């Protein structure tokens, strides 16, 4: 069974570490900095880094790739439509790869960037900066319609899917979620749970899709209360889920 843990990087990034205890091979996701990974390998002799998975081209996700590739000769997987350093395998929508014995389906999810991809294995979603705990990534390259479609695709995965995003943004995202839905009891409960985790210095990830559907405003655009709030914010009737999403995202950008 593959074990997944987080290697903290920078101020709020997580590099996900996937370990196969039977072979002592491991993989990392979005290593924006090589140092945390090299430190872990040094502290865990006998383990070999065999694979590097990259979701998109931003520096805080690829900054350590070349150094790690040089040190370990790991195979680098990344989106075909973005410039990824040292990439060995270019991935397109609906490709399938096998890493550490696990099959991963590749979904292209434009929005945060145009070529952004996610890696999905039954029960596990490695989603970079597309879906966050209680939030979603900023639209640096894509349109609101693209991001809405990408998030709807991810939200349709099984409810028990664990969500491994790459930033510790949960508390600030929940503040926005409460502004959108002040009467949502699930959000209030999650705020308290996350507050306790952070007070103990613990991470708030992974999340899961069932929880996201209850507490993430960007996955709740069809809820009447969310639509009403979005309509209030931009003073018009947002007729589609994509329009509600666009209103929420513009609000969150200034929140």
From Swiss-Prot:
Please state the gene responsible for encoding this protein.
gloB
Q: Does the keyword Metal-binding apply?
A: yes
Task: Give the EC number.
Answer: 3.1.2.6
Please tell me where Zn(2+) 1 binds in this chain. Answer: 56, 58, 112, 129
Keyword Zinc recorded: yes
Q: Name the residues that bind Zn(2+) 2.
A: 60-61, 129, 167
Domain of life, source organism: Bacteria
- The name on file for this protein is Hydroxyacylglutathione hydrolase
Q: How does it assemble?
A: Monomer.
Under the heading SUPFAM superfamilies, the entry gives: Metallo-hydrolase/oxidoreductase
- The reaction(s) this protein catalyses: an S-(2-hydroxyacyl)glutathione + H2O = a 2-hydroxy carboxylate + glutathione + H(+)
Describe its function: Thiolesterase that catalyzes the hydrolysis of S-D-lactoyl-glutathione to form glutathione and D-lactic acid.
Q: Which residues form a coiled coil?
A: none
MF-aspect GO terms: hydroxyacylglutathione hydrolase activity; metal ion binding
Report the pathway entry: Secondary metabolite metabolism; methylglyoxal degradation; (R)-lactate from methylglyoxal: step 2/2
- Sorted UniProt keywords: Hydrolase, Metal-binding, Zinc
PANTHER family reported in the protein's UniProt record? HYDROXYACYLGLUTATHIONE HYDROLASE, HYDROXYACYLGLUTATHIONE HYDROLASE GLOB
Q: Which organism is it from?
A: Pseudomonas fluorescens (strain SBW25)
Q: Cofactor stoichiometry and binding? A: Binds 2 Zn(2+) ions per subunit.
Q: Which family does it belong to?
A: Belongs to the metallo-beta-lactamase superfamily. Glyoxalase II family.
GO terms, biological process: methylglyoxal catabolic process to D-lactate via S-lactoyl-glutathione
Query: Which cofactors does the annotated protein need, by name?
Result: Zn(2+)
């Amino acid at each position: 069974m593959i074990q997944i843990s987080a290697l903290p990087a920078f101020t709020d990034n997580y590099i996900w570490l996937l370990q196969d205890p039977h072979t002592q091979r491991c993989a990392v996701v979005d290593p924006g900095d090589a140092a945390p990974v090299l430190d872990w390998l040094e502290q865990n002799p006998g383990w070999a880094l065999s694979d590097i998975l990259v979701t998109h081209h931003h520096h805080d996700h690829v900054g350590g790739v070349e150094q790690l590739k040089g040190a370990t000769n790991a195979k680098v997987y990344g989106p075909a439509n973005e410039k990824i350093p040292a990439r060995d395998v270019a991935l397109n929508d609906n490709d399938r790869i096998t890493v550490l014995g696990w099959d991963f389906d590749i979904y292209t999810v434009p929005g945060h960037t145009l070529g952004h991809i996610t890696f999905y294995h039954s029960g596990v979603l490695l989603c970079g900066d597309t879906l966050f705990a209680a939030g979603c990534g900023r639209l640096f390259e894509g349109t609101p319609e693209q991001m809405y479609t990408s998030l709807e695709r991810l939200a349709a995965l099984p409810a028990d899917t664990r969500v491994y995003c790459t930033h510790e943004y949960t508390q600030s995202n929940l503040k926005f979620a409460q502004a959108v839905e002040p009467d949502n009891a699930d959000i209030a409960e999650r705020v308290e749970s996350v507050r306790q985790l952070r007070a103990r210095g613990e991470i708030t990830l992974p999340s899961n899709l069932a929880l996201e559907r209850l507490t993430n405003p960007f996955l709740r655009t069809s809820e009447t209360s969310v639509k009403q709030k979005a309509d209030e914010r931009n003073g018009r009737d947002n007729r589609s889920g994509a329009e509600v999403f666009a209103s929420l995202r513009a609000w969150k950008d200034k929140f």
